[in-house]
């Protein structure tokens, strides 16, 4: 069962990306380094509720 999640920048808290996550395989929050257009650089993006 996959769940739609939103990734938010850890620096400026803007929600830039949305993706799917398999809840049965991953119980922890997703953290990915991606480009933030607001900050203008690659930052850590965390899964939001």
Swiss-Prot record:
One of its GO terms (cellular component) is cytoplasm. GO terms for biological process: translation. The keyword Ribonucleoprotein applies. GO terms for molecular function: structural constituent of ribosome. InterPro entries: Ribosomal_bL33, Ribosomal_bL33_CS, Ribosomal_bL33_sf, Ribosomal_zn-bd. Keywords: Ribonucleoprotein, Ribosomal protein. Gene3D superfamilies: Ribosomal protein L33. Belongs to the bacterial ribosomal protein bL33 family. This is Large ribosomal subunit protein bL33A. It comes from Oceanobacillus iheyensis (strain DSM 14371 / CIP 107618 / JCM 11309 / KCTC 3954 / HTE831). The gene is rpmG1.
């Amino acid at each position: 069962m996959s769940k739609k999640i939103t990734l938010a920048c850890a620096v400026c808290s803007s929600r830039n990306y949305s993706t799917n996550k398999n809840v049965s395989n991953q119980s922890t929050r997703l953290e990915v380094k991606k480009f933030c257009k607001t900050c203008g650089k690659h930052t850590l993006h965390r899964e939001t509720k």
